[in-house]
Amino acid sequence: MLARAKFRELTQRSGVDTRANRALVAQIRRLQGEAGSASTKKTCYGCLMAVGFVGAAAALIGAVATNGTDSETQGLCILGIVAGLVLGIVLIPLYGAVAKRLAGLQAQIAAKTETAWKQMEPLNRLYTWDVTVKLIEATVPRLAFDPYFTADRLASLHRKFGWDDSFNDGKSIIFAQSGEINGNPFVFGHYLDMAWGEKTYEGSKEISWTEWEEDADGKRRRVRRYETLYAHVTKPMPVYDEQKLLIYGNDAAPNLSFSRQPSGLTGKDGGLWSAIRKKWRLSRLKAYSRNLDDDSNFTLMGNHEFETWFHAKDRDHEVEFRLLFTPVAQAQMLNLMKDTTVGYGDDFTFIKQKKVNVLFSQHLNAATIDTDPSRFHNWDYDAAFAFFVQFNERYFKDAYFALAPLLAIPLYQQMRPHEDIWKDVLGREASSFWEHEALANYHGEDKFAHPSCITRSILKTRVVRREGGESTIAVTAHGYRGVERVDYEEVYGGDGKWHKVPVPWIEYLPVRRTSNMCLSERGTPSDLFKHRAAASRESAFRRSILSYLATT
């Protein structure tokens, strides 16, 4: 409902004439239908023309081949030549007419679509990066989102909650949305990671040899044999993957660490196999709880159903685990994990390290978490309305159920952090390196990549200079160049000999390139900064931050 109301508000502010746009869109849709029909006719006429002329050519070849020896066949060939030529010639003006009509329709569609874009321009200008999160804040008042991920927010995670930046090693942030729940910080992150994988390459070699064999008459003769030999080698290659996660800081249960993964039990209640599986998991937990030979202090709780589903057997502080997961928390967590009607069920990995909580959700990984307003731009008012509502409702659902495991724990909602004593150390407007990497990725990996790079690039940043709310950021793109290599593998051939089969492969060697990016988080950048940004071929205003790529 809020998304619909917000769209109506934006429409009213924009002054867009919705009736005129609907009428124009109806004309465009009608023209698109006519263009589709004309395109189909053009294709059919073209195919029939080709059939006619190709058939005539084939008949001509047949007539020449008979050379008058078969009068009946030659007569049929002549008939085919005439029929093919008549068909092709008759269709030429029809094809030309429909092609001309199609071109005219396409020109009309382009002109009217441009007019429709101009009609919608006042509305398209009103979309902002925070329009989606403002709707969530209005729906859930205890949630507050930051305009961008500040250094202040990151410092709070470091100093108050013990967050470690080692997580970011070898990763590049694509998008980050920070905020707080009841004063406790959280960050949604979308990042690019690289890991070494393997690729199998194939090579081949043709061989031949001579053999003697007896024919049906018992005579010996020489025959030539041929065989293709294949060989394979497996070599390392960089594999890139994008992931999304949620980081949350809370002082509750500060000495407790645990991890759990999706149980695989969602949607399997009531079946025999499900009952057997749950019973087996519970028996394993009971055996683990009774084992006194290891260093674990794991003690099974009375709620066996919760233990079976949540399955956090690596917890290291039983008292704080019970303090965190009260009977109410257990019930709410079970409801969350079982529900696939409204929510996504048990699709989340939950890792708690002292005061830091990290969650990975399958649905979040498939979701869109960036709020780029350009995605709402449209020339069709009704289509824009439908997409705006659908996107924002889906965004709310994805974000809410990513946060739901945290919201299911009452103690997390009761704990509010003390006033952040570090909030003035770096200044509230300074953006964090997460935001710098996201900005660089927004400009595009290709803008920073090494010229020899043939893979994706991991973009890492550092602040070179900061003065008066304006910063120079060094962006280093880490990628790999490819060097062609050849291995020779010995393969046994049908000739009874070993052959060296060449297998070409690519060796990936690291390359990097550093470029400068300038940015200003201030609402009103200096005139000099704005002039330089305007002069740059690559500038962007994103989430209250104006940035441009400096020439080198």
Where do the PLM segments sit?
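N-terminal topogenic membrane-targeting module
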Residues: 21-24, 93-204, 536, 545, ...
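Transmembrane alpha-helical hairpins and terminal membrane-anchor modules
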Residues: 36-116
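Generic detector of bulky aromatic hydrophobic side chains
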Residues: 79-82, 86, 116, 396-404, ...
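Short alpha-helical interface elements
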Residues: 56, 63, 134-137, 141, ...
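Cytosolic juxtamembrane N-terminal segments of multi-pass membrane proteins
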Residues: 1-43, 541-545
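N-terminal targeting/docking segments
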Residues: 27, 69, 257-260
